[in-house]
Amino acid sequence: MWGVVNLIPTKEEWNKALAERHGEKLQTKFSSVTVAICGLGGLGSNVAISLARAGIGKLILIDFDRVDITNLHRQQYKANQLGMNKTDALRDNLLEIAPYVTLETHTICVKEENATHLLQGADIICEAFDNAECKAMLTNLVLEEMPDKYLVAASGMAGFGSANSIRTRKITSKFYLCGDEKSDVQSEGGLVSSRVMLCAAHQAHTVLRILAEQFET
């Protein structure tokens, strides 16, 4: 029986394939950008996968947590990664998908005291926290202390509500909010993979639209 040959494309082949899908000019822009993802749970891990597949040049991955069995139904981790730092597990998974993406990882909790340092190298910041207070902290900090950076945040993706209620709204010229803006775990009774991934897809797509200069009205 013939063995399976595991052939990784060269970087040139990889970039050429992406350019065929996105156009060379836009792909060059994608590959030159750094996106920070704050929180690597149901939102952040899925955002990271989408952006890595799109050929974003560098991702800054930030999360303090470890992979838990309750994460597996909606987050981009595997059963054999239980107990690993999410930063390490997601790094491994991303490099299997997109071998030439540059990854910077920080296994740390984002706080007011360290956020500016952690995010200063990013062109676009994705807020992907679970906690409402953390969401508010990061949003306010970016808007007040890093007004030159784009922020793509999320609010409302719990339960079995209609997929069509997930939307992207432009709040300011550099602040976008994805989600239904009302559902939460307490009122809806839980999180469903498909709806969380839908919101994450809105976030990732918004990042790509910003880079393509196709802004929401």
Regions found by a protein language model. Give the residues of each.
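Conserved S-adenosyl-L-methionine
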Residues: 53-58
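A structured beta-alpha segment of the ubiquitous adenosine-cofactor-binding alpha/beta core
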Residues: 87-123, 129-132
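Hydrophobic Val/Ile/Leu positions in short beta-strands of Rossmann-like dinucleotide-binding domains
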Residues: 37-40, 61
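Glycine-rich phosphate/adenylate-binding loop
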Residues: 2-9, 118-124, 128-217
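N-terminal charged helix/coil linker that caps or initiates catalytic domains
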Residues: 1-35
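Glycine-rich phosphate-binding loop and adjoining beta1-alpha1-beta2 segment
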Residues: 63-97
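Hydrophobic/small residue at the entry helix of a nucleotide-binding pocket
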Residues: 43
